[in-house]
């Protein structure tokens, strides 16, 4: 009989009721923004308002914004990354004014510009070179700007954000779009417009935030402020809010390409006075969504849709409220290997995410701001298998419902930029999972331990209660910048633990030499992933393989980093760093065959160390580009906790104390990208990536080559170096070209064409072992993207 997903629980989250409660809370509590805000007013020499054109540029943060001011000559630039900005103000008939500004406070900065006989501060034109290097940075933050997002090369649907991040040093990609910041697993935190999301956001786990809806991003792996906790392998801040001129503005995108892929996106925003409202919708169809185990790409169709609505309102010059709701869902097939396809296997998966968010901000004084944020969210996933699934037919339904609260104060006092706050999460998780073993052997080779029962079912429910508080401060002392913070976390989901996390960072700069030296220390308290956690930590699951019950506990880590940033000639920047991480209860995952479903596990400990470097030319005449490289070594130590190990001999791992390379231990990673503006409306870009290869876990326990070739094909097996126990290196080259077909003022139509994997190389990402499935990267592909902005 077919194995169907279990019914969803009768109780469901009432988003509307939670939003009403959130609105009531927001009216009585203060809030604050994590980024800078510039409130600009432009006047003429007689004091009259001017509707001038304004440009803000920060090369270090890849930020370049242009706005036409309204008739009153006033505008608030929001969501600006901290750093140095070139401000240019122009109006026909007036002298252009320019200045270099530093924005380093969450408290809004007011600036008045006078055009006329006496322009702002100086008649000397300020260039972008002054914004190339952030002289007060205490760690390497990687910024991705609006132009990079718009002109990104085409990739697999649902991976636009992920592909942009993996071009940065320190970030690698495993099968099915799983991000690994500095070889960490299950340890990436996404922060969407100030709201943290801790679950796995790879395409195999949850619907993605597609890049078309993103204005800018920041990714960092060190010098992490105390306000961030739980998932600290890497933090990715995503900003979807745009600074636009008053009136209605919209974007429409249509894209089509290889593998029967088609996608569409539309967004519209209306700004009038103190109110801004926006909506967006997107969707895609494709026949290549996950990374298949064979070149034939069997059963890999997927479809996705998403809708978002947001409202921002400045009630007064001191009070602002923001609301948003979004709904995303994805339906996909699980790719088969050769044996599964021959058997007639069909497995379907689905995932959905619904969220409502509200935030309120109040300026309490010229140097103090407060904020509150409230979020409610429901995320779910399911798996269905037909009776021909082999060697196992599995079914799953899991659901996670959370309510999140964050309240904070931030202020500026002399040399200090400080912030303090609290946050809490009240959530529940439900898991239902079952399997039916159809074959313990395939082609005479044992693939599942004979000790496992042929049928197993699990159902669990648990409450998740988490609270945290923090304080942090940044002090500037001449050429020195020092930041420090302290965070306390309490975690209660199956286990009850708490931890203190001190954070410290410092930098020294020389403006004349164009150099910044920096170092940081981060203590981390990392909570286990909630996806399939109840089953992984269940005594009944441990008993399946003769093991014993060891609950998954929060990880505790010590991160150190030292590095520098150097500017050359006002056009070139070099960033380099060395890091080391020591972690107890190191998180990883146990993949269930090729289903994309994984179960959290933890090793006793792990150490990861490495070097990273990036040479970048943000803009030099017609050229821009970068070259990045990272070298890392990650070693973990048994025993292991959690997981669902069906492999023969897996029981030995529960008592072993051996050391081994962790599953995402890719030693060498290099990325390159170059862009050339051929004509004012025509450009081309080329990118390349190199990966030295991931380990093959349990390589000495794999079946003989003939069986592996029958399961995956000889062309896949040939991409494995069994002597080294690693996948062979991969290389991919891509080319893009774009043309602006039409432009009038702020309206434009552009066309972009991309070709990926130009050499059509067979690139293997993972190969089947104890802890990972088999997955290959896409072959050569092409796509065309048409974009209209109005």
Question: What residues fall within each predicted segment?
Answer:
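C-terminal beta-signal and adjacent terminal beta-strands/loops
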Residues: 4, 681, 689-711, 728-732, ...
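Periplasm-facing N-terminal accessory domains of Gram-negative outer-membrane beta-barrel systems
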Residues: 27-142, 196-198
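Periplasmic N-terminal accessory/gating domains of Gram-negative outer-membrane beta-barrel systems
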Residues: 94-95, 99-112, 120-226, 230, ...
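Transmembrane beta-barrel wall of Gram-negative outer-membrane proteins
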Residues: 256-285, 295-332, 348-370, 502
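Face-selective signature of the C-terminal outer-membrane beta-barrel domain
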Residues: 312-330, 351-496, 622, 626
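Surface-exposed extracellular loop regions of Gram-negative outer-membrane beta-barrel proteins
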Residues: 331, 338, 380, 433-435, ...
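Membrane-embedded beta-barrel scaffold of Gram-negative outer-membrane proteins
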Residues: 371-375, 381, 509, 551-609, ...
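Gram-negative outer-membrane beta-barrel transporters
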Residues: 476-481, 578-582, 601-700
